[in-house]
Amino acid sequence: MSIEELSTEIDVFLLAEEDKVAKLPKGAIIVSDPVLQYYESLAPGEEPKQIFVANASESLRCVYPLINGSLKIESLYDTGSQIVSISEEKAMEAGLSWDSDIVIYMQSANKGVENSLGLARNVAFLFGDIVLYMQVHVIRNPAYDLLLGSPFDTLTESCVRTTKDGNKTITIHDPNTHQRAVVPSVATVWFGP
């Protein structure tokens, strides 16, 4: 089998009887592994071609902007979030004020629903020489200090470059001055809610 012949379809098998060696019960569903099939199909002594596969997980990435001219905050870069948000504790440390009449309801990863405390408007974020003004939702006790979601990407027309070792750099554009900057990110360990 050549590497080009690797299956792009998933083969699924239903175990007709218990497999005592593999400790699988009758009725277990077995999914084939095309990479393993390729390696097992090689003739003795045949040199395998290198196959790149994704890691099972990757570290989340953080950046460290100066917020409101007063506090550098570890900011979780999360393009899957619809908002930019900050913990109540860090909002207070940075001296932010917020409008408590603007509240959103959010569903967390554990399916709970919580409301935000309000919206801090036009908060200054300094990345190198670039100042961006973001609308930031204030959240009570989130699992992060600050979360940079899609509004950050949209405002900055960001371009992310990811390397095979997991490093990410984010190129941002200041819509007010038209400056560009490359912002390095740092791996972080996130334990979730």
PLM regions and their residue ranges:
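Pepsin-like aspartyl protease folds
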Residues: 4, 9-70, 104-119, 147
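Short phosphate/oxyanion-binding micro-motifs
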Residues: 77, 94-95
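Short conserved micro-motifs on helix faces and helix-strand junctions that flank
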Residues: 75-77, 146
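Conserved tryptophan-centered aromatic signature that marks the ligand-binding surface of SH3
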Residues: 72-75, 82-84
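Aspartic protease core domain of the pepsin/retropepsin superfamily
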Residues: 11, 32, 82-89, 95-193
